[in-house]
A protein has these predicted regions:
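Alpha/beta-hydrolase superfamily serine-hydrolase fold, recognizing
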Residues: 2-368
Length: 368
C-alpha cells in the first residue's frame, strides 16, 4: 500500500470519488446528495474488492472478540474451488446467533450468498438480529466501516480513516444512501466510516453534532481493534453533513468556543476535511436554503422509483426555517448561528466543493 501517495492526494481522491467514479453528472446537479439518490436509483455496482462491516453501535462498547470472530469467519468463506462464482463467494451475511463457528473451509457458501450485491458482514446486537432488515438499518447510532479487501486478512492492519457525514438538511438521509460512495473511497486503501446520526425535528440541536462527537470518540478509543491509523484521520461531509463536519472542526479546534457549549464535545481533529455543498452562513436568513429544503416542485416530489422525496418530508416539518428545525434555546441558537466567527488557525486544511447549479454555492464561496 502506497501510504505516502494516499496522504498526498487525499483531496484529489475525495473529488474523484464524488465526481468521476460515482456520477459524472454530479457537477450539474442542484445539490450534492442528489447524486447519492441518483446513484442508488441507478443501481450502480459496488466494487468487489471492498468489504462492508455493518451496524456497529458507536454508543456501546465494542465487542472486540466478536468483531475479530466475524472477520475470521468471513475469511474462511474465501477458501473455495468454485471459481465460477469467485466474486459472489466473497459475500456472506452474518447475523449474531445464526453464525456457525464450526464453518468449514471446504463448505461452499454459495447458498448463503444468494441475492447479495456486495461484500457484507453484519454486526448486529442480538436484540436486532431478528429484525435486521429494519432496525439495524435505521438505528441512529449504527455505523458501517467500508474496508479494502486486504484489510480482512491483514493481521497488522492500520489503515488511514475517512469519516463520512451524510447530508439531508438535518432531517433526512441515512448511511445507506452513501454506502456506494464510501465503498469507492475505500477502494483507495482507506477505512471509511459511514454512520447514522439523530435527525430533526424529532431530535433538536445539538443531537446531530453530539453524535458526530460520539462517533469520533468511538473510533479513537477503538482504533487498534478497528485497524485504523488515527493519526491519519480525515472527514468528508455533504450538505448538512458538510455543516456538521465544519461545526465539529470548529468545536474541536477552538477551546473558547467549546467551553461555551453545554453538550458533549470531542477535540480530536482530522488532518484534512472535504466539504461538499455545505450550508455555512447560518447567521443570515438565506432564501435559497429554505427553497432547497422546503420547496415542493412537481418534478422533485418523487424519486424515479415513485417514492416520496425528501422535499415532501420537509413540508411536514413544524417550521419553514431550517435553523428552527435544528436549534432549540436562544443561547444555543446564537452559538449555532455565529459558528463561523470561531474559525481559527487550528481549523484543519479544507477542500471545498460545490456543483455548478448548487443552490448553496454562495455558502462555499463565502468561506473559500
Amino acid at each position: 500500500m502506497d501510504r505516502e501517495r494516499m496522504m498526498k492526494n487525499v483531496a484529489e481522491i475525495f473529488s474523484r470519488g464524488a465526481v468521476e467514479k460515482n456520477l459524472p453528472a454530479w457537477v450539474n446537479m442542484r445539490h450534492a446528495w442528489k447524486a447519492s439518490d441518483a446513484a442508488r436509483d441507478r443501481g450502480l455496482e459496488y466494487p468487489a474488492n471492498v468489504v462492508q462491516i455493518k451496524n456497529l453501535d458507536y454508543k456501546k462498547e465494542l465487542d472486540e472478540v466478536r468483531f475479530n470472530e466475524l472477520i475470521e469467519i468471513w475469511n474462511k468463506g474465501q477458501h473455495t474451488n468454485d471459481s465460477d462464482n469467485s466474486v459472489q463467494l466473497q459475500n456472506k451475511e452474518i447475523l449474531n446467533d445464526t453464525v456457525d463457528l464450526t464453518y468449514e473451509a471446504d463448505e461452499t457458501p454459495k447458498s448463503r450468498c444468494e441475492g447479495l450485491e456486495r461484500n457484507v458482514v453484519r454486526f448486529a446486537d442480538s436484540g436486532d438480529a431478528a429484525d435486521v432488515d429494519s432496525a439495524s438499518y435505521t438505528s441512529n447510532s449504527y455505523m458501517d466501516i467500508c474496508v479494502p479487501i486486504s484489510y480482512m486478512t491483514d493481521e497488522n492492519r492500520k489503515y488511514p480513516v475517512i469519516v463520512s457525514v451524510h447530508g439531508g438538511g438535518w432531517f433526512y438521509g441515512d448511511k445507506e444512501l452513501y454506502s456506494h460512495y464510501c465503498c469507492l473511497l475505500a477502494e483507495h486503501g482507506y477505512v471509511v466510516v459511514n454512520f447514522n446520526y439523530r435527525l430533526s425535528p424529532q431530535n433538536k440541536y445539538p443531537a446531530a453534532i453530539e453524535d458526530v462527537a460520539y462517533l469520533i470518540r468511538y473510533i479513537h478509543e477503538n482504533a487498534q481493534t478497528l485497524g485504523i491509523d488515527i493519526d491519519n484521520f480525515y472527514m468528508v461531509g455533504d450538505s448538512a453533513g458538510a455543516q456538521l463536519t465544519a461545526n465539529y472542526c470548529i468545536i474541536a479546534s477552538n477551546s473558547d468556543y467549546r467551553a461555551k457549549l453545554d453538550f458533549f464535545t470531542y477535540d480530536l481533529l482530522p488532518k484534512k476535511v472535504c466539504l461538499n455543498c455545505g450550508a455555512y452562513k447560518m447567521a443570515e436568513r438565506n432564501d435559497n436554503i429554505s427553497a432547497w429544503y422546503l420547496r415542493n416542485d412537481v418534478d422533485d416530489d418523487q424519486n424515479s422509483d415513485g417514492k416520496t422525496s425528501s422535499h415532501d418530508k420537509a413540508e411536514k416539518c413544524e417550521s419553514k426555517k431550517i435553523s428552527q428545525a435544528y436549534a432549540v434555546t436562544e443561547e444555543q441558537y446564537k452559538l449555532f448561528m455565529d459558528q463561523l466567527d470561531y474559525i481559527n488557525a487550528d481549523f484543519p486544511e479544507a477542500y471545498l466543493m460545490y456543483s455548478v447549479n448548487d443552490d448553496l454555492a454562495s455558502h462555499t464561496k463565502a468561506v473559500d
